[in-house]
Design a protein with these regions (language model features):
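Aromatic "clamp/platform" in nucleotide-sugar-dependent glycosyltransferases that forms part
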Residues: 224
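Conserved donor-binding/catalytic core segment of Leloir-type glycosyltransferases
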Residues: 142-161, 167-171, 179-180
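Extended catalytic core of nucleotide-activated donor transferases of GT-like folds
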Residues: 42-122
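A charged, aromatic-enriched C-terminal amphipathic alpha-helix characteristic of glycosyltransferases
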Residues: 140, 282, 291-325
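Donor nucleotide-sugar binding/catalytic pocket of nucleotide-sugar-dependent glycosyltransferases
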Residues: 110-141
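N-terminal pre-catalytic "stem/leader" segment of glycosyltransferase-like enzymes
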Residues: 1-75, 314
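Short hydrophobic beta-strand element within catalytic cores of glycosyltransferases
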Residues: 241-244, 249-254, 260-261
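Nucleotide-activated donor-binding/catalytic signature segment of Leloir-type glycosyltransferases, i.e.
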Residues: 187-210, 218
Length: 329
């Protein structure tokens, strides 16, 4: 049985979710999977590498060889203390969070598995042998929840979701349907008050979040950039009509056939990623188009989004298993 070690900072948010999804996908494909969740702390930075070196030495002395695993999968960051613990080392990077300090370790890697097609040339340009595996998201669909002709924006704690422009635009359109925004207190500058805006700043139970996701026909996800885009993909999974930026990698997931695209007005950069920003006029155009779309067409778009979600989930699980097997052979 092929032994795989998943390595990432267990932050309780996106990386923890990725660890869980990868663990389930690889376990279902008959791999022996270990999760090495890394915690923050100055003491950990000293003690953890020392423990790994001691364990590696003990394996050598016992005649078992230094490599406990066949493949290390490192999420987002290169973890050099683990390089000697596996026969093959792989990075699953996010362009927008790539740390330049990791460049010196790239020659030690056997492969990069990237989550979007947009990321392939980015990491090939760094000299990495790069393979598109894609990714998946949790299936949040609950067909028992009645759907409302309303809009939802899951801002969370991210500063890359285009939330401020969204709220400002909605305030100028009191005749638009209700917009519900969920945002972390760490990210919210203020709580917006308007007759057709419900701005919830704080944390809610996951069951309530799932209900809200399923209850809204429209999900607004105008991200500046995404490593993959769980909140876009979860929205498609519940059969919502999703609006996002007409820019990579967001428009890999959302197309006009299964959602709405917002034209970017300007660009910027964040690490290796290009960031995209929209203006009020572009959002107005996209929202008005959705509001003028028939219910039958909206239902068709939501069904197409759900179909894409299911197809993508199956394809990812097949690709990641095949990629790991080929590398470990």
């Amino acid at each position: 049985m092929i032994r795989v070690n998943l390595i990432a900072r267990d932050n309780g948010f996106g990386l923890s979710r990725n660890l869980h999804l990868l663990h389930d996908a690889l376990t279902a494909a008959d791999f022996e999977v270990t999760v090495s969740g890394i915690r923050r702390g100055a003491l950990r930075k000293i003690l953890h590498p020392a423990r790994l070196r001691a364990r590696t030495l003990a394996r050598r002395l016992a005649g078992r060889g230094p490599q406990r695993w066949d493949v290390n999968l490192m999420l987002e960051r290169v973890r050099p203390e683990y390089l000697a613990t596996a026969r093959r080392n792989v990075l699953l990077p996010h362009p927008e969070w790539f740390d330049q300090r990791d460049r010196k370790w790239l020659p030690r890697l056997d492969r990069a598995f990237v989550l979007t097609r947009h990321a392939v040339p980015i990491f090939e340009s760094l000299g990495l042998q790069t393979e598109y595996t894609g990714f998946t998201s949790e299936d949040r669909r609950d067909p028992s929840v009645p759907r409302e002709h309303a809009f939802f924006h899951l801002a969370g704690r991210s500063a890359n979701k285009g939330t401020e422009t969204l709220l400002a635009t909605w305030r100028h359109h009191p005749g638009w349907p209700r917009l519900t925004v969920l945002q972390s207190p760490r990210a919210a500058r203020e709580t917006v008050q308007a007759s057709n805006i419900t701005h919830r700043v704080g944390y809610i139970a996951d069951a309530e979040l799932k209900r809200i996701q399923n209850a809204h026909r429209f999900h607004l996800c105008p991200s500046e950039t995404e490593g993959f885009g769980h909140y876009l993909v979860e929205a498609m999974g519940v059969g919502a009509v999703v609006a996002t930026l007409d820019a990579p990698p967001m428009n890999e997931m959302v197309t006009r056939e299964r959602g709405a695209l917002i034209a970017p007005a300007r660009t910027g950069t964040q690490s290796l990623a290009t960031t995209y920003f929209y203006d009020e006029a572009a959002l107005e155009h996209a929202v008005e188009r959705l509001l003028s779309t028939s219910d039958d067409e909206l239902e068709r778009m939501g069904t197409a989004a759900r179909t894409w979600f299911e197809d993508n989930d199956r394809a990812f699980k097949s690709r990641i298993a095949e990629a790991v097997r080929a590398l470990a052979a």
